[in-house]
């Protein structure tokens, strides 16, 4: 669990990043969850955008993905979400 200062620092880092993954008309699949989990392990911080063709709401998608990948939702802005999960390598110093 992150405290507010850590969340603020991670949000600041995420602001400068582009979306690493996109969710389209296929919505959330097992393959997408595995890809997101692998990305979280490699980068710890993942920005995901939801395309207009997706039939799932942004908040619902964020909660489903966070639950499936055991990650935390840092922020949801528009159709973009940012997820964080500490990796075994502990890449980011908070």
Task: Pin down the residues of each PLM region.
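Positively charged, polar, low-complexity stretches
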Residues: 1-94
